[in-house]
């Protein structure tokens, strides 16, 4: 259960870090946005290492579903744009896929 905490925290740090660069490069905001962006992306990487997993690739694949869901919350609450039904369908498919990766049977390796 603690993995979900790290996944969600990491997702919002990654999104915030990327959004800082988006503000600078796409919306013409100050280049100073790079500094909190770099800090946030560094924190994202550190947080993702807190996840208990035997293999990094499997942890990152499971994280992908959480990231996609967090992105829609960012869209709704930070950018104030209402997600479409197709956005939510896409999130549901991603979360189901991530759940298969996370909870699927494991052969002894």
From Swiss-Prot:
Disulfide bonds: none annotated. GO terms for cellular component: plasma membrane. The keyword Transcription regulation does not apply. InterPro entries: UPF0060. It is found in: Cell inner membrane. Coiled coil: none annotated. It comes from the Bacteria. Belongs to the UPF0060 family. This is UPF0060 membrane protein PA3275. It comes from Pseudomonas aeruginosa (strain ATCC 15692 / DSM 22644 / CIP 104116 / JCM 14847 / LMG 12228 / 1C / PRS 101 / PAO1). The lineage of its organism: Bacteria, Pseudomonadati, Pseudomonadota, Gammaproteobacteria, Pseudomonadales.
